[in-house]
Structures are given as structure tokens and as C-alpha cells.
Amino acid sequence: MIDNIEIQKILAHRYPFLLVDRVLVFEPGVRAVGIKNVTINEPFFQGHFPGRPLMPGALLIEAMAQVGGIVCGQLPEAVGKIPLLVGVNKTRFRRQVVPGDQVIITAEDLRTRQKRFGIMQTRSEVDGKLVAEAEIMFSLVD
């Protein structure tokens, strides 16, 4: 398990854009399973949407990319580099994420090429049901 303090040593993100609370499973360079606890106190709920709060899909993708960043950030070729989101393919949103949900995010390294570019297969679930999935592309930059 990786707690929030350790996550902040791996990722450059901070509140309000650090969207991973904890990592339950971690296989360096292979896969990670992280958690995002969604509360009504999230700043994005003020405007998305008043009276019917929903987690924006773009932020769900960002949370999946951050779990992917934890995986690729631990690759040997990533030492001293920052993993940046450079593309998203095959994205599907299946269900809404609302306050009180605990999102379980899985990211698996599909392939890392040229030691600077890679693709992660990601998925998010709430209560065992798929809410979103995407292929996340990243680049390692100095």
C-alpha cells in the first residue's frame, strides 16, 4: 500500500488536483490500483452541477492518468523525469460518479516505447461496476 504522503513523493500534483488518495496494489512498472474517495467537499461540485453533483469526466480521466503516472513514474527510464498525459484513446464513460462514491482505479502498462513514451490501460469502478475506461498515453519529460 502507498499512502497519500508517499503518493506526493511520486506525483507532482497537489490539492485540488491530486486525485488519488491511496494505492492499494502496486507492482512497479507493471500496474497499480488506487482509490479516489469522492466527497461533497470537492471544489468541482460547486458548479458541476448545483443540485445534482457529478464528478466531471475530464477529472475522472485525470485520476486514471495519475494512477498511471504512479506506474510509469517508477520505471527505470523515468528516474528524474515527469510523466505527462499526452493523449487519451478508447475512452468510455459507463456510469456517473457522485459524492460518497469510492472510485477504484486500475492502471496497467500496455507498452513503453523508446523509453520516453507509453500507453496505460485504465479503468475505474464504483461498487464493482465499471464507470469509465480509457487508454492513457504518456510521455516522460525532463
From Swiss-Prot:
The keyword DNA-binding does not apply. It is found in: Cytoplasm. Coiled coil: none annotated. It catalyses: a (3R)-hydroxyacyl-[ACP] = a (2E)-enoyl-[ACP] + H2O. CDD domains: FabZ. GO terms for molecular function: (3R)-hydroxyacyl-[acyl-carrier-protein] dehydratase activity. This is 3-hydroxyacyl-[acyl-carrier-protein] dehydratase FabZ. Keywords: Cytoplasm, Lipid A biosynthesis, Lipid biosynthesis, Lipid metabolism, Lyase. The active site is at H48. Belongs to the thioester dehydratase family. FabZ subfamily. GO terms for cellular component: cytoplasm; membrane. Involved in unsaturated fatty acids biosynthesis. Catalyzes the dehydration of short chain beta-hydroxyacyl-ACPs and long chain saturated and unsaturated beta-hydroxyacyl-ACPs. One of its GO terms (biological process) is lipid A biosynthetic process. SUPFAM superfamilies: Thioesterase/thiol ester dehydrase-isomerase. Its main location: cytoplasm.
